[in-house]
């Protein structure tokens, strides 16, 4: 990359960055937080944060990068995608109705407590089962890629670890005080560190817990935007340190700075992967919607499907194995836009932008229902569901549409099952006479009025 080429790229990058930041800041001033703001920040992190890191690697360490044409196309495609997404998100699909609608479901105190206990139990039990089968993998494996090898059993259990976070979100939203906010951080980060040691280097739970803590603080006004930026910088350094431990790297001096640049870029902003995919566009045999279907394979146990393929050809694996002919054992993320290109070429980019806009709009709709809900138990469930799905949005931006669809469906099923089981448990305990109502003014308050009713758990 010459200085002239860098100058041209920088102009495009700066225009794109100002465009997205302006729209995001306007939204922030209007509502302070919604999932459009979160997705926009996540999008900036994924597709734009890595550009200065790439430039430092090129000019400071003479690193070979993707051809400039591909980098330019990646920046232009990313900006066009966001523009279409924003229009799709802002388009009103129906007129707002002032007529109250019948609630789909209601919640009471006991049902809500059962729900978060079930969610937490799912996470704790599966971590225990994984540990019993494998021990502390962080101290047993020689390299991170061994996590995906046949010597590690019960890999599917890792999908359940995340449910500890929505469980703690329910606890917080039941009584959103600063004390519970801090408890959320301590409990989820501690659990994330446990999973990091048990699994052997998976940092997702720690990152998500810290990010949720920050965004809840922004929503409540407990931290400022500058505090968020400072905490983000601390988080980046923390993730770099964990990456060094994960890959067993011992670096210092200029080598440490070089390692910091490329690990931070690959962790937070794999935008060069998208450029690399565009550079190999002629090698892509468009997969259609098959990667979405294939990504569900990992949720099907082998005893139920004896002939299940060991290697799932989703968009990330297709990009790694078929396009790049890379069989190192680690999948290279194609990013959100890259997964669309794998499925249907550049024509899928505007279609995907429209669909993503509608998805984020749906999450914001549920979030608003939770904020406006007068039943605080139902409000806690709705808001915990939305904030709990933030991990899936990170997967959407970083990994792609296929990974997002399978994970969000899985998340909804497990969350919904815990909700249904909690209601069944409440019905069983109530039928057995183990739950009774409080008395208010010489009369029993009806269970159907959850705002005025408090259930005592054990009689």
Swiss-Prot record:
Intracellular or extracellular location(s): Cell inner membrane
Membrane topology type: Multi-pass membrane protein
Protein function: Probably involved in the polymerization of enterobacterial common antigen (ECA) trisaccharide repeat units.
UniProt keyword annotation of Lipid metabolism present: no
Subunit structure: Probably part of a complex composed of WzxE, WzyE and WzzE.
Protein name from the UniProt record: Probable ECA polymerase
Protein's GO biological process: enterobacterial common antigen biosynthetic process
């Amino acid at each position: 990359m010459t200085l002239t080429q860098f100058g041209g790229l920088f102009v495009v990058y700066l225009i794109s960055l100002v465009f997205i930041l302006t729209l995001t800041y306007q939204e922030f001033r209007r509502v302070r937080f919604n999932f459009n703001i979160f997705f926009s920040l996540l999008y900036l992190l994924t597709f734009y944060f890595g550009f200065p890191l790439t430039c430092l690697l090129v000019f400071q360490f003479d690193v070979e990068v993707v051809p400039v044409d591909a980098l330019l196309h990646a920046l232009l495609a990313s900006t066009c995608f966001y523009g279409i997404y924003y229009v799709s998100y802002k388009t009103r699909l129906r007129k707002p109705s002032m007529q109250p609608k019948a609630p789909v479901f209601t919640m009471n105190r006991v049902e809500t407590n059962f729900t978060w206990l079930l969610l937490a139990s799912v996470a704790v039990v599966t971590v225990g089962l994984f540990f019993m089968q494998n021990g502390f993998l962080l101290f047993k494996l020689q390299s991170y890629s061994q996590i995906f090898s046949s010597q590690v059993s019960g890999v599917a259990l890792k999908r359940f670890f995340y449910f500890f976070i929505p469980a703690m979100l329910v606890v917080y939203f039941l009584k959103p005080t600063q004390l519970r906010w801090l408890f959320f951080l301590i409990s989820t980060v501690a659990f994330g560190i446990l999973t990091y040691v048990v699994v052997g280097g998976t940092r997702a739970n720690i990152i998500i817990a810290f990010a949720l803590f920050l965004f809840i603080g922004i929503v409540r006004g407990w931290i400022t935007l500058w505090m968020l930026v400072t905490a983000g910088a601390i988080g980046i350094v923390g993730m770099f340190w964990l990456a060094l431990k994960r890959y067993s790297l011992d670096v210092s001096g200029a080598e440490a700075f070089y390692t910091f640049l490329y690990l931070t870029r690959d962790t937070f902003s794999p935008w060069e992967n998208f450029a690399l995919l565009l550079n190999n566009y002629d090698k892509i045999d468009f997969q259609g919607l098959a990667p979405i279907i294939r990504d569900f394979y990992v949720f099907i146990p082998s005893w139920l499907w004896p002939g299940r393929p060991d290697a799932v050809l989703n968009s990330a694996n297709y990009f790694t194995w078929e396009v790049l002919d890379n069989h190192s054992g680690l999948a290279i993320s194609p990013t959100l836009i890259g997964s669309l290109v794998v499925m249907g070429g550049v024509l899928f980019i505007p279609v995907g932008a429209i669909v993503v806009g509608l998805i984020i709009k749906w999450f914001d709709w549920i979030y608003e229902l939770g904020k406006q809900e007068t039943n605080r138990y139902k409000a806690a469930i709705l808001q915990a569901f939305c904030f709990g799905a933030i991990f899936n949005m990170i997967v959407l931006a970083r990994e792609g549409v296929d990974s997002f669809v399978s994970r969000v469906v899985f998340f909804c099923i497990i969350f919904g099952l815990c909700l249904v089981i909690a209601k069944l448990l409440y019905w069983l305990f109530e039928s057995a006479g183990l739950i009774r109502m409080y008395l208010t003014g010489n009369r029993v308050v009806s269970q159907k009025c959850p705002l005025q009713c408090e259930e005592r758990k054990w009689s």
